[in-house]
Amino acid sequence: LRKKNGREKPWKVKYFGVGNENADILFVGEGPGENEDLQGEPFVGKAGQLLDKYLQVIGLSRDKNIYIANIVKCRPPQNRDPEQEEQDCCIEWLRAQTRIIKPQIIVCLGRIAAQKLISEDFKVTRQHGEFIKKGNILFMGTFHPAALLRNPANKPDTLFDFQSLRDKIKELKIEI
């Protein structure tokens, strides 16, 4: 797969995620961007800084009480959306992470993650902030922080989604 994507050299990504491996809340993004690829950690660029602000508002922290991972584990060329084949190649890694972490809630950041984990026809613009139970896990999709940087008009909706997440955490009596 790396050869197909012009990635003949070893991956720069050193980590498949970051955070508390015993977290009850798992955030899943699409894949690493340029900064993430260089630093080997998800959400470290401007989108990551925005995500950290939303987390802080509701009392969450990537260092303490959540885990962050991605659908794909290496950066697609030209920062394009990961192709289905790339997603399928990496999804077992995410499933293994989910089995190890055992989250109660998975927050899908953006369309790619939501369509891969919640429903193929998930529409972030219509279904963001909704909780959907699959097995023993509650899923919620919301806007990807990078999309918010491109379209700040969705920031209030995203804040509301995060506040709904905070309320769900309290309802489920999840210790944070």
Give each language-model segment a name.
Residues 1-176:
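A polyanion-binding, active-site-adjacent surface
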